[in-house]
Amino acid sequence: MNTTATQTVHADRLPDVDTDVAIIGAGPVGLMIANILGLQGVRVTVVEKLDQLIDYPRAIGLDDEALRVFQAIGLADTLLPHTTPDHWMRFVTKDGHCFASIEPRTDEFGWSRRNAFIQPLADRVLFEGLQRFEHVQVLFGHGVEAFTQDGHGVSVEVTTSAGRRRTIRAAYMVGADGGNSIVRRALQVPFEGRTKPNQWIVVDVRNDPVGSPHIYMHCDHERPYVSAALPHGIRRFEFMVMPGETEEELSKPENMAALIRKVVADPDKVDYIRKRVYTHNARLASTFRVDRVLLAGDAAHIMPVWQGQGYNSGIRDANNLGWKLAMVAKGLADGRLLDTYTAERRAHARSMIHLSEVAGDIFAPNTRFGVRFRDAFVRSFNVLPAVKRYFIEMRFKPMPRYEEGVVLLPPPQHRGGWLARMLERAGNSAPGRLLGLMSEKRESFLGRLVYGKDPLAGSPVGRMFIQPRVRTADDRLALLDDAIGNGFAVIGWGTNPTFGLTPQARALAEKAGMRFVLAKPDVQLRHGDDVPDGVIAIGDASGRLKEWFSRLPQSVVLLRPDRFVAGVCSPQQVSEAITELAGKLGMTEVPPYAEASTPSKTSRPVLDPVTVTQAAGA
């Protein structure tokens, strides 16, 4: 990786840069996308206006989906020392009584579902991961002044912190430059939503003066606050800023001591890292793509912190967008593939905003009615065990489910009558947001009541595939993704997924880098006569794959690089499924019966001279 702050070439200009993808913002989302593209041999230039990575804590929660993405780019083991697995969230009363605890213990995707982490160290892991790639560079101290785009690429004008200018020419650009995104504002993309009336002061300290594990949400009517244990002896406190208070006033030693005294006996012995006031926003961009420019992370959506989903939603964006950008940049797929990014990610980002708002409504209601509603809701746990399990096991969390895009499904049927419209109108109230969130799970009772029966509710298509531990041919136990590798995969349970494959389907599969996998009971793995050349055999060490396939009439699953299920089929339908998937991807045609070759990772699109069709000022 090339890391550049400034170079002395001319008095006012630096050498221009030609790249495949320009990423604006060296935060976690931009760095994650750069790693995904770097692994695919795509040339990347990351542009960051600051002179270095941000070194203070921000996000503190990492979920299993995000850890799976770190695993995919080969950095999970480097990140894990900076995490705390099984980090439960406990809601307590003013006197310290725990009335609810979110502690999911399942590991469908191979990792703990709730993890604490230190974001600056995670960002550092992502940044140092780019050192693996000579074709990726990060330009610190470079601020975007303007950009233009035409039918062949994007031209970005940047200025260094020393006042020198340069032009970056890319086939595509990603705006991952935060909630105040220059890129989004220049594109004039609406960013609609609301700002919460209350601010919060966040205080991070070293040498944890409390020491108790997990995160505690203190539902104090007078001043709600949070106490969270983080790795490496760091503790985070968050206190609601009451009307009339200011950051300057609260930061005074005597006022800060009064706040900390709620949790710590001797606030004078606290080792502060930083204090900062935040405003919670809930906003969503109207689209995540404008021609050759895409938005990701906080530039596309921002949400309150209460479920720690802002960071994780950004990583989901990177996971969805990265492989698609790589296919388009390498000439494997048509640019229309990028339209599926908004189609697939925007709806779920909206759901996570709703989830975050509901969690805030429960923790810190804005009205007396909200407090009474919250208390009544919590008391129901004692008489309704099913409600308590729903809450504790995080069943309320909307999981990504793609009904359109790169999925082999019929066109979605948007249902919902007067009850759905009523819930939508009630979305500005706490009860309305809660009921609306619960109804988003279409297979639930409330979801069926609001939207009617969903014929595809039980289908795994469009959902993330499980990741159990499997046994490899050399008798190792490994997580599924490590055993079969990244990229597209076709997994057959107890059947050879390549049997009867047509030459055209095989050519398409080879062009896409698709791997074929035969999964079978662990005890059968030593018998290899049923495993042809070019097929990966895995043993179902835990029985989870057999359980997953037993719910379906089909025994073959097609996986996307982001590990979402693209489709399911019978063994005799694999050729048709691959051909249909290639059409969804917009893959360039492979002539029937032609010998396919894997494209070079270093292949580059040819960029024509700039013809400005769109101008945007910073």
UniProtKB/Swiss-Prot annotation:
Q: Which cofactor does it need?
A: FAD
Broad class of enzyme this protein falls into? oxidoreductase
Q: Which GO terms describe its biological process?
A: 3-(3-hydroxy)phenylpropionate catabolic process; 3-phenylpropionate catabolic process
Q: Which UniProt keywords apply?
A: Aromatic hydrocarbons catabolism, FAD, Flavoprotein, NAD, Oxidoreductase
What does the record give as the reaction this protein catalyses? 3-(3-hydroxyphenyl)propanoate + NADH + O2 + H(+) = 3-(2,3-dihydroxyphenyl)propanoate + NAD(+) + H2O; (2E)-3-(3-hydroxyphenyl)prop-2-enoate + NADH + O2 + H(+) = (2E)-3-(2,3-dihydroxyphenyl)prop-2-enoate + NAD(+) + H2O
EC identifiers of the protein: 1.14.13.127
**Pathways involved:** Aromatic compound metabolism; 3-phenylpropanoate degradation
Which residues does the record give as FAD binding sites? 20-49, 288-298
Q: Which residues does the annotated region (Disordered) include? A: 592-618
Keyword Flavoprotein annotated: yes
One Gene Ontology term of the molecular function aspect: FAD binding
HAMAP family, per this entry? Answer: MhpA
Q: Which family does it belong to?
A: Belongs to the PheA/TfdB FAD monooxygenase family.
| Primary role | Catalyzes the insertion of one atom of molecular oxygen into position 2 of the phenyl ring of 3-(3-hydroxyphenyl)propionate (3-HPP) and hydroxycinnamic acid (3HCI).
Q: What is this protein called?
A: 3-(3-hydroxy-phenyl)propionate/3-hydroxycinnamic acid hydroxylase
Which organism is this entry from?
A: Cupriavidus pinatubonensis (strain JMP 134 / LMG 1197) (Cupriavidus necator (strain JMP 134))
